[in-house]
Amino acid sequence: MRILLTGAEGFTGRPFAAHAAAAGHEVVGLRADLTDAEALQREVGDVRPDAVVHLAGIAFVAHANDEAFYAVNVLGTTNLLGALVRLAAPPRMVLLASSANIYGNTEQSPIAESHPPAPVNHYGMSKLAMEYMARTYLDRLNVVITRPFNYTGPGQDVNFLIPKLAMHFAKRAPMISLGNLHVEREFNDVRTVCDAYLSLLLHGEPGETYNVCSGRPYELQYVVDLFARLTGHAMRVSVNPDFVRANEVHRLCGDPAKLDALLARSGIELDRPSLEETLGRMLSAAAQSERSSNSEPGTPKQFA
């Protein structure tokens, strides 16, 4: 199966491409800018994909340019779907990665796909708008939508929480500045997400939306303590008010029952590594990166 992958060089795109290739599929990374409809049309026509995994988009909630969320996450996706419907033979399946952020703040836990969306930031709003827009194509394309809950792994940008922690603990930094230590999130492994996406390309039901989650949330303070236990390093944590968002989602925990039941019908069970295993992999990668940087003379060390 030839898979057109957007965001192929991103945090999820790289391991997904490797996972799909290992399973015998051909993966072609999209080169065109999603906001350039003409270039996108040409490239999609050249690739003629059997399936599409759309991961490209702005994923950092605190991104400074609010308009960019909509330009890329909504209009860029519109351009992609518009190019796909013009193919003589449309792809068998199109997977669109949305986000659990569309649920917003809710007392419901775990959250099922049927829960009413109520996003509280531009990132979540742009993803929900993308979902609604995509549904206008369901009469012409087989589309599945995923709502991944928080996940992490080696290679994630240090703008995100867990990689930032891994870097600081690997460097045995004396302190770190964080936001609210009492928010609760799932911290799933990127490998699980990649496995789920490939499985949904093959077995997903068109028009359906699936949470990609574990149903196991952790308070941030617990994660900090686990890093300390894994490294034997006690680090002072400073709560920086600038990192505490006014519209913070306090608890985000998904219900995996719908996806698990779908895959079980095909004899598939997702492997969900423990948080300790995931953090261990990230510490190893961060330590390797630290050793590499130390081998370069004149590299400054900065901690924040």
Segment roles from a protein language model:
Residues 78-122:
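Conserved Rossmann-fold NAD(P)-dependent oxidoreductase catalytic core, especially the SDR/UDP-sugar
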Residues 34-72:
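NAD(P)H-binding glycine-rich loop region in Rossmannoid oxidoreductase-like domains
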Residues 272-304:
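Amphipathic terminal alpha-helices
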Residues 109, 132-185, 190-199, 224-230:
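NAD(P)-dependent short-chain dehydrogenase/reductase
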Residues 3-21:
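N-terminal Rossmann NAD(P)H-binding glycine-rich loop of SDR-like oxidoreductase domains
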Residues 190, 209, 222, 242-269, ...:
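Conserved C-terminal active-site "lid" loop/helix of NAD(P)H-dependent oxidoreductases
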